[in-house]
Amino acid sequence: MGYNKSLRYSRHNGTTCVIDNKHLKSLGSVLGDVRHKEELIREAQFDPIKDIANQYMVTEDPFRGPGKNVKITLFKEIRRIQPDTMKLVCNWSGKEFLRETWTRFISEEFPITTDQEIMDLWFELQLRPMQPNRCYKFTMQYALAANPDYVAHDVIRQHDPYYVGPDNRERINLSKRGLAFPLTCLQSIYNENFEEFFDQVLWPYFHRPLVYVGTTSAEIEEVMIEVALLFKIKEFAPDVPLFTGPAY
């Protein structure tokens, strides 16, 4: 960094005085000048880095992007997880959809109408310990690009898992690159045949996740697992105003 004339002089407001022909100033003003000079030097060093960084673009979190989030809870279930193992959350098979837990907690109607476009799809997992005062963390592993004919194991060994995010909640993006989701009659398909809604509507255009969940505990733990699909939809402007009158 070169010589800067603006760093030569200190700026004092009522902090200096002259006693016995000696120029005095308060120690606080000296410390303030030091901090001010350090800030100027730091800004001068950061400016060239900022100019270079402005030439590049970075991606933001797509979950916080434009659009409206619509959540559909698939099921809630209490499962026992053995130590050093991970249990499959959902295998998306036909027999699993007929269980009582799916029909009890499932949404009665599909909240996305035909005039709304699906921009993105997320698999949301919420984990809760069933016993109080338990000190352990939730672990997780998942696969997206699995073969449709692959039969997933119900229980696997923990091998290099990662910890579930804050609030014991994790979201997985299921979008495939280069595939646009068509506008179809989603509401009628969802209400008529729930199983075909996944096999014929979602999985041809989105990844089918295989998610395993475990704990760091050395004992058998009971965990409440809540699975939901979170749709990011694009809302189109209506053709006519929703309200009429002098105030609108």
Curated annotation (Swiss-Prot):
Protein name in the entry: Granulin
Gene Ontology cellular-component terms listed: viral occlusion body
Entry GO MF terms: structural molecule activity
UniProt keyword Cytoplasm present: no
Family: Belongs to the polyhedrin family.
Keywords annotated in UniProt: Viral occlusion body
Top-level taxon: Viruses
Species assigned in the record: Xestia c-nigrum granulosis virus
Protein purpose: Component of the virus occlusion bodies, which are large proteinaceous structures, that protect the virus from the outside environment for extended periods until they are ingested by insect larvae.
InterPro entries (alphabetical): Polyhedrin
Keyword Transmembrane: no
